[in-house]
Amino acid sequence: MATVIAKIKAMPTSPEINKETLKESLKELVEKFGAKCRGVIDEPLAFGLYSVFIMVEMEEQEGGMDPIEEAMNALDDVESAEVVELSLV
């Protein structure tokens, strides 16, 4: 099986959400799926809004990144999450 690297963009529900807490929640969620977090960064947008990008590495499997993406979307502090880049290594 191949290794998959994905870049997932998560948008918080409001600018008041603590960035560091959100980043830690996303890292923990990724690790629950047996994947490795290869980096997390936040990118400012406007008016205090920001997006969080998380790099995820895992073995290729049926369903791909969908289960992780769905779990991120289910978090209370996440408005939306989507895979923006995907590559096989």
Swiss-Prot record:
SMART domains: EF1_GNE (SM00888)
Gene3D superfamilies listed in its UniProt record: 3.30.70.60
InterPro entries for the chain: eEF-1beta-like_sf (IPR036219), EF1B_bsu/dsu_GNE (IPR014038), Transl_elong_EF1B/ribsomal_bS6 (IPR014717), Transl_elong_EF1B_B_arc (IPR004542)
Keywords, alphabetical: Elongation factor, Protein biosynthesis
Organism the protein comes from: Methanococcus vannielii (strain ATCC 35089 / DSM 1224 / JCM 13029 / OCM 148 / SB)
GO MF annotations in UniProt: translation elongation factor activity
Function: Promotes the exchange of GDP for GTP in EF-1-alpha/GDP, thus allowing the regeneration of EF-1-alpha/GTP that could then be used to form the ternary complex EF-1-alpha/GTP/AAtRNA.
Protein family per UniProt: Belongs to the EF-1-beta/EF-1-delta family.
Listed SUPFAM superfamilies: eEF-1beta-like
Gene for this chain: ef1b
Source organism, top-level taxon: Archaea
Name the UniProt record assigns to this protein: Elongation factor 1-beta
